[in-house]
Swiss-Prot record:
Residues 1-26, 82-95, 159-203, 267-269 are extracellular. One of its GO terms (cellular component) is plasma membrane. It is found in: Cell membrane. This is Olfactory receptor OR9H1.
Amino acid sequence: MVNFTHVSEFVLLGFQGGPGMQAMLFLIFLILYGIAVVGNLGMIVIIWVDAHLHTPMYAFLQSLSLLDICYSSTIAPRALANSMQEDHTISFGGCAAQFFFLSLFGITEAFLLAAMAYDRFIAICNPLLYSVSMSHQVCVLLISGSYLWGVVNAIAQTTMTFRLPFCGSNEINDFFCDVPPLLSLSCSDTFINQLVLLGLCGSIIVSTFLIVLVSYIYIISTILRIPTMQGCQKAFSTCASHLTGVCLFFGTVFFMYAQPSAIFFMEQSKIVSIFYTMVIPMLNPLIYSLRNKEVKQALRRSMQKLSL
């Protein structure tokens, strides 16, 4: 008979190294998190105060900025604390909560990026129907639906993962509570969990990516048919920033979770984890502001008001 011991806490191993290494990690995490919070908060405020940006496109962007703040805040505070102290433990409940919110915000962002692609598709391919197809009610429905699916996924994943019996080592070879390292600590067969992970999360990621892909195939084909170069550039500039953000998000997710489990627990995987949990939330406000003329104009108007 196997003796299952109840695990009351986990140890987040993170990156191994001496005090110098940990101090450097603290500085890196602090800079990434600080820029992510300030940048995304600034984006939310600019869209909120500038009436010219009160459109569905920027409502989605505002929601994305809020998601990025929440997403990075689920990881960064714990990572900062662990890099400055020897005790890297996290309670069972704390690990479950972190896991839940990571699942919630990650899947919600995938749906939100798909909704943003659909918004650009309607705006460029069917501009005469835009006010009807992307009304305020539709916009609210798409945003709330994204969160709803995120909650459903998070509840399913968290319930199935933390109902597993854990025995032996309680060391998670990462700096946050993620699915693969948690499943490796379970004493029981995790085939059903892996099947649900592949079926639920995999289908969500693939389906949202396909929505984005099909939308941009139509968008690009429509842009290429615009007779004037100026019109073509203007149309492409409205979706170039979103396309960049989509490539960063889905490219990193596919790289992270589509690789064989045998090579998952490598230091490179931890670096990729930092990229999609901290670097992407930091880059998004820069991408959407520096490559968007309307946001830059709104920023100038806000600066002029402050200088008066």
